[in-house]
Amino acid sequence: MEKISRNKQDGAGISIKDQIKKFAINGLYGFNTIILIGMGRKLGIFDYLYEKTKSISNANIVKFTLDELAKKLNLDVNYLDAWLHLALECGLFEIDDLNRKILKTAPFVYELLINYDHNSYIGGTLGAFYNIAPAQEIMLKNFKTGKAMDLLKLPSDVVKDLQERSRRFGKLIEKLFTKSFTSFCKNLNKKGSILEVGCGYGFNIETWAKKYEKTRIIGIDIDPKGILAAKKLVEENNWNERIKILKKSTHEYAHTTKEKFDLIILNQVLHEMNPDENYRNQLFKDLYLLLNDKGILLVGESMVPDTFAPREPFKLFDITHKFSEAGSARFYNEKTFKAFIDSTPFTKAEFIKEGGTKFWTIRK
């Protein structure tokens, strides 16, 4: 094997100092940030900060004290002090200029990590990565056995967090879809209907229900815990008259209802379904039955390139998605997904992409 000198490596524009910074310094900051966010969500810290400011118009900074959090959330002061100290070092919070005992959120942290109603919120996405840790032992065993991991058998709070990872992508997709199909969306909001397949805990339904206030929505799923959470969400928002949540498979629903929908949504669901091509082909036959003749099937999926394909921009989350669900999911890339659609009754498929936001619109 050819011996590669340090100078030759440096000649490629990367020094050993660069790599130390990347792996040891930046890596540790990133790792600690994920730990802080995950623990902050589990301990209720971010929820408390959200509730504290949600009634304030245009709030973008939250101020608080260590003692306040300890008292309100019944947390040990020593552990909380250590968490806050690391959060200060990682840039989540800052010390207030006027009072050194008061902390405040760093710029844009409120929008990114606390206010889950904000379009830029990524707390759910980053918080979900925290849950890779408890799944590591299962993943390590599966490296040897090749067994699939049943995500629904993980603790319900972990499953909920993993599904919330899709909340941000769902919001971005809705925003881009509404911008790209203005005429269709105007009619959808007047008297239209939406079916979400694999509605889970209702995060995506919440996004569309708030934007399309006159649209009827049906959500279906086979996970009983997700169904209960989605129904609770509907009740809390007084949406019972126009939104129904049903515990049914797509095949069962397609063959027991006469209703047709203007928009059918599959948001980060297809990859988790049975990987067998015949099963998925039947799924799309059922979706074809449920869609109006002029309707749109919207599929939001991570498009994962081949491992040895040339590197593409905006693929970190897609490839991380593949890694976190390896063995229990089957993904497509743009070429293989288009080939799959060509094998179904649908005749038109368009890939919509803007930056890192992407989805497919499929028609009869």
Where are these regions (language model features)?
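Conserved SAM-binding loop
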Residues: 230-231
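A short acidic, Gly/Pro-enriched loop at the edge of an enzyme's catalytic core
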Residues: 251, 255-264
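Conserved Class I S-adenosyl-L-methionine-dependent methyltransferase catalytic core
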Residues: 26-31, 39-40, 90-189
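Conserved SAM/SAH-binding beta-strand->alpha-helix loop
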Residues: 223-225
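A short glycine-rich, Lys/Arg-flanked "PGG" loop and its adjoining helix->strand segment in the class I
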Residues: 281-293
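A short SAM/SAH-binding and catalytic strip from SAM-dependent methyltransferases
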Residues: 262-277
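Conserved SAM-binding loop of SAM-dependent methyltransferases across substrates and taxa
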Residues: 201-213
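C-terminal alpha-helical "lid/dimerization" subdomain adjacent to the S-adenosyl-L-methionine
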Residues: 298-344, 348-351
